């Protein structure tokens, strides 16, 4: 599949404006196709980014702690079904084996996956598996809590529904004690 030109993308925006009953040649909408294309370039900038490069800077130290947890990483993504936003928080825990990464690296990988068309379930797995694959910890736990515009702006019109997804690897998947501790910590907010 070849990537459309910028002009083809702008024409697609004009077509959508006509589809909803608007006149793309009216004053307020003249620059909208450019703005949409620029916005999409930023919003969907997660494509082509390499998570392994982000998690490549590791600190190899004797770990004097059992596990590492980063709570409340805020994100906004777009559902691949309706191209409507969903936003929420990501909680990530891992039990290091012999290395750790700076906390900003975890927030960066959340942003990489959030800046793609997504479904929350897949994003949860992608974050957990990328940490597992690149850091090789004893286990990883990821929880995403999000509100979906596709439920609040259309269809069932439920604006207070929060979807929670979790994915576990290693000792979090194998030992209930670790899952229980993670869920207790993430619930206390």
UniProtKB/Swiss-Prot annotation:
Q: InterPro entries annotated for this entry?
A: GTP-CH-I_C/QueF, GTP-CH-I_N, GTP_CycHdrlase_I, GTP_CycHdrlase_I_CS, GTP_CycHdrlase_I_dom
The alphabetized list of GO BP terms reads: one-carbon metabolic process; tetrahydrobiopterin biosynthetic process; tetrahydrofolate biosynthetic process
Catalyzed reactions: GTP + H2O = 7,8-dihydroneopterin 3'-triphosphate + formate + H(+)
Record-linked Gene3D superfamilies: 1.10.286.10, 3.30.1130.10
This entry carries the following GO cellular component terms, namely: cytoplasm
Q: Which UniProt keywords apply?
A: GTP-binding, Hydrolase, Metal-binding, Nucleotide-binding, One-carbon metabolism, Zinc
Q: What is its EC number?
A: 3.5.4.16
Class of the enzyme per the UniProt entry, highest EC level: hydrolase
**Which terms in the Gene Ontology molecular function aspect does this entry carry?**
GTP binding; GTP cyclohydrolase I activity; zinc ion binding
Keyword Membrane among record annotations: no
Its UniProt pathway annotation is: Cofactor biosynthesis; 7,8-dihydroneopterin triphosphate biosynthesis; 7,8-dihydroneopterin triphosphate from GTP: step 1/1
Residues binding Zn(2+) are 79, 82, 150
Q: Which residues does UniProt assign to the signal peptide?
A: none
Q: How does it assemble?
A: Toroid-shaped homodecamer, composed of two pentamers of five dimers.
NCBIfam families documented for this protein = folE, PRK09347.1-2, PRK09347.1-3
Q: Which family does it belong to?
A: Belongs to the GTP cyclohydrolase I family.
Q: What is this protein called?
A: GTP cyclohydrolase 1
Source organism lineage? Bacteria, Pseudomonadati, Pseudomonadota, Alphaproteobacteria, Rickettsiales
């Amino acid at each position: 599949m070849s990537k459309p030109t910028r002009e083809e993308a702008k024409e697609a925006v004009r077509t959508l404006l006509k589809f909803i009953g608007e006149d793309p040649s009216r004053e307020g909408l003249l620059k909208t196709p450019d703005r949409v294309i620029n916005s999409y370039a930023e919003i969907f900038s997660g494509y082509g980014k390499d998570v392994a490069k982000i998690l490549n800077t590791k600190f190899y130290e004797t770990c004097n702690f059992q596990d590492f947890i980063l709570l409340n990483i805020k994100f906004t993504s777009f559902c691949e079904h309706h191209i409507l936003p969903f936003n929420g928080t990501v909680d990530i825990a891992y039990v290091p084996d012999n290395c750790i990464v700076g906390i900003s690296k975890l927030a960066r990988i959340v942003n990489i996956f959030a800046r793609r068309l997504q479904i929350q379930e897949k994003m949860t797995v992608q974050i957990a598996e990328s940490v597992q694959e690149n850091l090789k910890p004893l286990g990883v736990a990821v929880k995403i809590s999000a509100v979906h515009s596709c439920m609040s702006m259309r269809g069932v019109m439920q604006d207070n529904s929060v979807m929670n997804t979790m994915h576990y690897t290693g000792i979090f998947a194998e030992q209930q004690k670790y899952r229980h501790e993670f869920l207790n910590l993430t619930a206390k907010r």
